[in-house]
């Protein structure tokens, strides 16, 4: 079912793209590994190019990581507290004890958009287990937290915001929350 859903999702994206609803300027950006600026990394602001993790980190190999995706509008993170609560809830479900408080993560998120001078953009907090050991659980691995932010305008062509956009709703039902841990 998931494969079919993904296939349908991409067909819809292709349909929208073929109708030129998307703003293609988003696709013409600097690769993320070539950008400049700062990233909040384990409590410090580091140069974008120095925010690196080891190839053998547990988060990469065993998916022991969680993240959020947050939009910035007019210099403010949309529903920041709700996103942060969900990040902490996801971490708890993964058995990850957060090394920072919700207040510290909110403060760091606001700090990074201020330092990056972002008016409209995107914030990506990520939490993962480090590379101290490779095992199924690796509960003793250090927990790392990074928060990146970058400019990211609207998904849609600006003139379509004025003209309006036709949307479709799917007959597919979302899986219930208790279907996945």
What label would you give each PLM region?
Residues 2, 9-11:
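Short terminal hydrophobic/aromatic SLiMs and anchors at protein ends
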Residues 15-16, 120:
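General helical secondary-structure elements
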Residues 22-181:
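Conserved alpha/beta cores of soluble small-molecule-handling proteins
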């Amino acid at each position: 079912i998931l494969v079919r859903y993904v296939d349908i999702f991409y067909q819809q994206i292709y349909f929208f793209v073929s109708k030129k609803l998307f703003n293609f300027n988003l696709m013409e950006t600097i690769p993320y590994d070539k950008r400049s600026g700062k990233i909040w990394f384990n409590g410090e602001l580091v140069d974008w190019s120095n925010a690196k993790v080891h190839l053998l980190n547990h988060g990469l190999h065993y998916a022991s990581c969680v993240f959020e995706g947050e939009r910035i509008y007019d210099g403010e993170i949309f529903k920041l507290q709700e996103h942060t609560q969900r990040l902490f809830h996801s971490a708890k479900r993964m058995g990850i004890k957060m090394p920072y408080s919700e207040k510290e993560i909110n403060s760091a998120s606001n700090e990074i958009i201020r330092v990056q001078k972002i008016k409209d953009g995107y914030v990506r907090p990520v939490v993962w287990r480090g590379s101290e050991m490779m095992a199924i659980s690796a509960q003793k691995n250090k927990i790392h937290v990074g928060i990146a932010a970058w400019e990211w305008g609207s998904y849609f062509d600006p003139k379509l915001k004025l003209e309006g956009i036709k949307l479709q709703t799917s007959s597919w039902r979302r899986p219930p929350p208790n279907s996945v841990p």
